[in-house]
């Protein structure tokens, strides 16, 4: 998960809003994957996971009517551990990895500008990738993780719903923020 706050996500949504209003998804592909089981899960314990996203965008200035959003993912699945399961000098992360997976999805988007409208900036494209692009690819990421964990002979993992922060009314205080995926 990332250290971004709800306020950061809302700022990115505002920056990418013009693209979000005009872009349509045309194709989705899994570009690469590498997965490994490091140890069997402990039957008496549940599993927990950590999923990190790294969004990026590829756009050719000569054909700016289309762009590709890539989401690189790093998944770590661990045994849930009690504090007494950790040996001195080890961290829970070092002792509990059951499996890891690195994979990347890409989506092709196209859009149509209105007459006289400027091409999107790199900042708009990057903000779109981190917000709407991530939301567009997330159902495919969820399905892939569910399928992958089953194929690795692990209990199928259903990822949590990806949430979007709520806008705050003008003059209202920001609620306590937490990191979002």
UniProtKB/Swiss-Prot annotation:
Organism per entry: Mycobacterium tuberculosis (strain ATCC 25618 / H37Rv)
Family per similarity comment: Belongs to the SecB-like family.
Inactivation phenotype: Disruption results in slow growth. A triple higB1-higA1-Rv1957 disruption mutant has no visible phenotype.
Protein name: SecB-like chaperone Rv1957
Record's function text: Chaperone component of an atypical, type II toxin-antitoxin chaperone (TAC) system. Prevents antitoxin HigA1 aggregation in vitro at a 1:3 chaperone:antitoxin ratio, probably also protects antitoxin HigA1 from protease. Required for neutralization of toxin HigB1 upon ectopic expression in Mycobacterium marinum or E.coli. When expressed in E.coli complements a secB deletion, restores export of OmpA and MBP and inhibits aggregation of proOmpC although it is less efficient than endogenous SecB. Complements the general chaperone function of E.coli SecB less well.
SUPFAM superfamilies: SecB-like (SSF54611)
InterPro entries: SecB-like_sf (IPR035958)
Subunit (UniProt): Homotetramer, interacts with antitoxin HigA1.
Keywords on record: Acetylation, Chaperone
Residues where N-acetylthreonine is found: 2
Top-level division of the source organism's lineage: Bacteria
Alphabetized Gene3D superfamilies for the sequence: SecB-like
Record's GO cellular component terms: peptidoglycan-based cell wall
Induction / repression: Probably induced by the DNA damaging agent mitomycin C. Part of the Rv1954A-higB1-higA1-Rv1957 operon, as well as the higB1-higA1-Rv1957 operon, which is probably the mitomycin-induced operon; the former but not latter operon is autorepressed by HigA1.
Disulfide bonds: none
């Amino acid at each position: 998960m990332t250290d971004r706050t709800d306020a950061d996500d809302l700022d990115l949504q505002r920056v990418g809003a013009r693209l979000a209003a005009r872009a349509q998804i045309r194709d989705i592909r899994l570009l690469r994957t590498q997965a490994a089981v490091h140890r069997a899960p402990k039957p008496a314990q549940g599993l927990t996971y950590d999923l990190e996203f790294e969004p990026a965008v590829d756009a050719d200035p000569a054909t700016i009517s289309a762009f590709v959003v890539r989401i690189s993912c790093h998944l770590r699945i661990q045994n849930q551990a009690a504090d007494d399961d950790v040996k001195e000098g080890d961290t829970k992360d070092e002792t509990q990895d059951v499996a890891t997976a690195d994979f990347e999805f890409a989506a092709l988007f196209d859009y149509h500008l209105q007459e006289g409208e400027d091409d999107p900036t790199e900042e708009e494209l990057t903000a779109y990738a981190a917000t709407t692009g991530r939301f567009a690819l997330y159902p495919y990421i969820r399905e892939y993780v569910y399928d992958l964990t089953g194929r690795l002979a692990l209990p199928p993992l259903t990822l949590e719903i990806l949430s979007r922060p709520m806008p705050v009314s003008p003059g209202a205080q920001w609620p306590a923020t937490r990191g979002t995926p």
